[in-house]
């Protein structure tokens, strides 16, 4: 009977170690996910800025495709 108790104690100890490792892994994954979300949010802000800049660009200084001279290989 004492052997059974020792085996159960070893199994419980092993499960506690696994649980602690999993908790640490979950915390690390949560931190990584939070950092990625911040990066995504920052990139969305930057993208909106770039799109806004492109929309306000003066396209009148650009030539139409029909006015462009063809490349030399034509």
Curated annotation (Swiss-Prot):
Gene3D superfamilies reported for this sequence: 1.20.5.300
Transmembrane segments: none
Cystine residue pairs: none
Pfam family, one: SlyX
Family (UniProt): Belongs to the SlyX family.
Name listed for the protein in its UniProt record: Protein SlyX homolog
Gene designation per UniProt: slyX
């Amino acid at each position: 009977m004492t052997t059974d108790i020792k085996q159960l104690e070893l199994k419980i100890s092993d499960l506690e170690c696994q649980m602690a490792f999993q908790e640490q892994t979950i915390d690390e994954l949560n931190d990584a996910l939070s950092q990625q979300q911040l990066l995504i949010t920052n990139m969305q802000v930057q993208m909106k800025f770039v799109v806004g800049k492109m929309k306000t660009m003066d396209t009148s200084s650009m030539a139409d495709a029909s006015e462009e001279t063809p490349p030399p290989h034509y």
